A protein has these predicted regions:
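A contiguous, surface-oriented mixed alpha/beta subdomain in the mid-to-C-terminal portion of proteins
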Residues: 259, 626, 645, 649-772
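Eukaryote-specific, cytoplasm-facing alpha-helical/coiled-coil scaffolding segments in long proteins
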Residues: 178-199, 297-298, 312, 621-623, ...
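Amphipathic alpha-helical scaffolding segments
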Residues: 156-159, 163-185, 223, 287-294, ...
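Long, acidic, intrinsically disordered low-complexity segments
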Residues: 92-109, 555-604, 708
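N-terminal interaction modules that seed assembly of large macromolecular complexes
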Residues: 578-639, 643
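Non-catalytic, well-ordered alpha-helical scaffold segments
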Residues: 156, 211, 215, 591, ...
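Extended alpha-helical scaffolding segments
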Residues: 1-141, 168, 174-558
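Aromatic- and glycine-enriched beta-alpha-beta binding-site module
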Residues: 147-175, 621-668
């Protein structure tokens, strides 16, 4: 609610002073990590001992930095060129600032009776209203005051705090309808309708941060002769113009303005006046000042990138028209690295055609300093990006974007061209790899009959977020790398491993519906899309995105460090190899054993065959304590029974082992139905197998498929199947086995890497004995 103006305020205003040149009000972070308040005079005198400005918000920090830059530009009246700048860089201190502040001290008094700093004396509304300080203290997020201790409203501010928010208001105040002030001819029925946000609020601001505040100030102190910039000789900050009055400055006084960086850094986009008493500020009057169109300010504003607006060119008939390139709050800064470190204009069809985008001139300035040898080759820098994200017709601040990148000056020098190329191409790698993860989520959604768009976007963002820290750390290492190309190859492998883990998590949690899949249209006709095919596509896309050889698809469930599946598989291989050799040579005992195994419905018959063959000690005495004997027995018994069903009465070996092309279950079923899209019965059996929830149901579905394999004379590696059956019974094993069957089903000969020599290679003993 508005507060009534206090009658004592004019008396208090004449009695009090808050001199920003001598009073502590700027929050700074010292090199020792301590935050303190300093005056304008102190901040320049001690800049070499300070780390940075430490504002209440990132946007406030930038607004205060731009104020300091305007002071420094004006105090040195330049720099005009690199030589001027280097003299400042080489000097022990910024000696010109102190006398400059003395000369303009009256204009830096927050409470001055006639020229209060960045305010309009005697500003008032027609009703004499004084409004809550919420009008100038930014709410982040929307509707939630940043200072939670001051909920639900900001009732009072110290003079130091108020000074900071006054600077912030001119830079980032919201748009929307504001109460009109006396003598503002834009007022209609007591209101002034939206005229835009503060000037800095329209920017995707980027600046360079050095090791100290002194370095930061000088690195952003762009010379007047910088290519692409045009600073007028009469460029000066707000305090060297006539004091503002209520309403807009007369147009005749704005001719040729803004005149340069000093003018823009202090542009008076608002008219305001603080109301206070002896202990602080308790209210404010806030209205519109001088609105500023962002069109083609690229010759005066160095702290933002620019994009060419074809729509505005068509509308106005003027060419070219550049607008500030705002930050995308959903994307980390490193995804835009190309626009920051590559100095050439982008997408110019011909030399005479204006570029579609322009790099921030402040970064062109760093490149120029490097080209002229004014900065060391590997000096550490931070590129910082700050921006306000406005909501609802820009009448509120929804969020604040802040990000940074740590790198070195090498990336701004021609000697670092190779490093820049690898850094930018690694961003392309990351973006494409995140797209692959998003496509996996989309394919799984399609396979389950869901809308693919939202999962794609969500998983892509998750992929970018997962790569974020890895890329930033890699970029720091890149600066010192002798072989940037080799380091990028390392980055690609790291990124691949990370996104494979995320994809694995997604696939592990895929639903039974996604495993069942859908028949979908593709450029090659009908296609059965399920979670297994989605996984194959994911690996293919990821390998392509990261310029790696085809990602090796593990066709069997991972054994990790658990020796149990291998031990169980070795036993099954030994038993089945022996029985199969004896059966194929016509030994009666083996024929009898096979008949008993084939008709076995329980474990008794299988146990009898194992006992008669002398394999019981091996089954009961497996070397690893990690083996779950109950699960091992069930796996071995089931595998023997299935093999017997498969083998009898065939004269060829139905159990076949090979490290190079293992007869895996999924691959065998694919041979059974090469066109699975048109093989409904086989596909349904395979789906039911994968969705089986109990071990008896699993074996029942396997028996049906094995019968089909037997009829087609298609072999199977039963040692691997035994390992699958053992793993299936472990926690998480059902999904792992189903995925391995799906991978082998969709694997194509010659395009998928065969399993690497590992525990599977040891399943084929070379000293098989005939024990039947």
């Amino acid at each position: 609610m508005p507060e009534k103006s206090q009658s004592a305020a004019p008396i208090v205003r004449r009695q009090l002073s808050f001199d920003l040149t001598s009073q502590p009000w700027l929050p700074v972070l010292r090199l020792d990590g301590v935050i303190e308040l300093v005056s304008l005079r102190e901040v320049f005198a001690r800049a070499h001992t300070l780390r940075r400005i430490a504002g209440d918000l990132p946007t406030q920090e930038l607004a205060l930095l731009r104020l300091l830059l305007a002071i420094l530009h004006d105090a040195v009246d330049g720099p005009r060129d690199v030589a001027d700048w280097y003299a400042l860089w080489s000097a022990d201190s910024l000696t010109a600032v102190a006398p400059y502040l003395d000369a303009h001290r009256d204009r830096f008094d927050l409470l001055h009776p006639t020229t209060p700093f960045f305010q309009v004396a005697e500003l008032r509304t027609a009703k004499g209203e004084v409004f809550s300080l919420n009008r100038i203290v930014a709410d982040v997020p929307n509707g939630e005051p940043f200072f939670s201790a001051r909920l639900p409203a900001v009732d009072r501010l110290s003079f130091a705090e108020a000074a900071r928010w006054v600077v912030h208001a001119h830079a980032y105040d919201t748009s929307g309808i504001k109460t009109g002030t006396l003598d503002d001819d834009r007022t209609v029925r007591g209101k002034v309708y939206p005229l835009g946000v503060g000037w800095a609020g329209s920017l995707g601001a980027v600046f360079v941060e050095g090791r100290t505040l002194r370095e930061t100030l000088l690195l952003n102190l762009v010379a007047a002769d910088t290519h692409g910039l045009r600073f007028a000789d009469h460029d000066r900050p707000a305090w060297r113009h006539l004091p503002c009055s209520a309403g807009a400055t007369p147009l005749e006084l704005l001719v040729g303005r803004p005149s340069g960086a000093r003018d823009l850094y202090t542009w008076q986009t608002r008219r305001l006046l603080l109301h206070y008493d002896g202990s602080g500020v308790h209210g404010v009057v806030l209205g519109y000042g001088d609105p500023l169109s962002p069109h083609n300010k690229h010759r005066q504003e160095p702290m933002t990138g620019w994009r060419r607006s074809l729509a505005q060119e068509t509308k106005s008939g003027e060419q070219p028209i550049y607008l500030p390139k705002e930050h995308d709050g959903t994307r980390p800064l490193w995804l835009a690295l190309s626009a920051l470190v590559e100095g050439r204009p982008t997408d110019s069809p011909t030399p005479s055609e204006p570029a579609s985008a322009l790099r921030p001139r402040a970064l062109n300035w760093i490149s120029r300093l490097m080209a002229e040898g004014r900065l060391p080759l590997d000096m550490p820098l931070r590129l910082r990006a700050v921006g306000a994200v406005y909501g609802t017709q820009k009448s509120v601040i929804d969020d604040i974007f802040e990000d940074h990148l740590s790198l070195t000056t090498r990336l701004f020098h021609e000697q670092g061209a190779g490093h820049v190329q690898q850094a930018v191409e690694a961003v392309t790698d990351a973006s494409a790899a995140a797209d692959a993860l998003g496509a996996l989520a989309s394919d799984l959604a399609r396979a389950s009959g869901s809308e693919p768009g939202p999962p794609r976007r969500a998983l892509r963002e998750r992929g970018v977020a997962a790569l974020d820290g890895m890329y930033r750390a890699w970029l720091v290492r890149l600066a010192a790398a002798d072989d940037p190309h080799k380091l990028r190859k390392h980055w690609q492998r790291e990124a691949c491993g990370l996104l494979l883990c995320l994809g694995d998590e997604l696939l592990t949690n895929a639903s039974d519906t996604a495993w069942e899949g859908r028949t979908v249209e593709s450029v090659r006709g009908l296609l059965w899309l399920n979670s297994a095919l989605a996984e194959r596509w994911f690996h293919s896309r990821l390998a392509k995105a990261l310029h790696l050889p085809a990602v090796s698809l593990p066709l069997e469930p991972p054994a990790s460090a658990d020796p149990a599946p291998r031990e169980v598989a070795l036993l099954a291989a030994h038993v089945i190899d022996s029985l199969q050799k004896s059966y194929l040579t016509g030994r009666p005992a083996a024929v009898t054993s096979l008949a008993r195994l084939r008709n076995a419905e329980g474990g008794a018959a299988v146990r009898a065959v194992i006992n008669n063959g002398g394999w019981s000690p091996q089954l009961n005495g497996m070397g690893s304590a990690a083996v779950n004997m109950r699960h091992a027995e069930k796996a071995v018994y089931a595998a023997l029974s299935l093999w017997a069903l498969h083998q009898q009465p065939r004269a060829e070996a139905m159990h076949q082992q090979s490290c190079r092309e293992p007869a895996l279950l999924g691959a065998a079923i694919r041979r059974l139905a090469p066109r699975i899209e048109s093989s409904g019965p086989v596909r349904k059996r395979f789906v039911r197998l994968g969705n089986a929830r109990t071990f008896p149901a699993l074996i029942q579905h396997l028996r049906g498929l094995v019968a089909l394999l037997q009829a087609r004379n298609l072999p199977l590696d039963y040692s691997l199947l035994t390992a699958d059956l053992y793993i299936w019974q472990q926690p998480g094993g059902r999904q792992a086995v189903r995925r391995s069957w799906g991978r082998s089903f969709h694997a194509r000969r010659g395009t998928d890497a065969v399993p690497e020599a590992g525990w599977l290679a040891n399943l084929h003993p070379s000293d098989d004995k005939d024990s039947s």
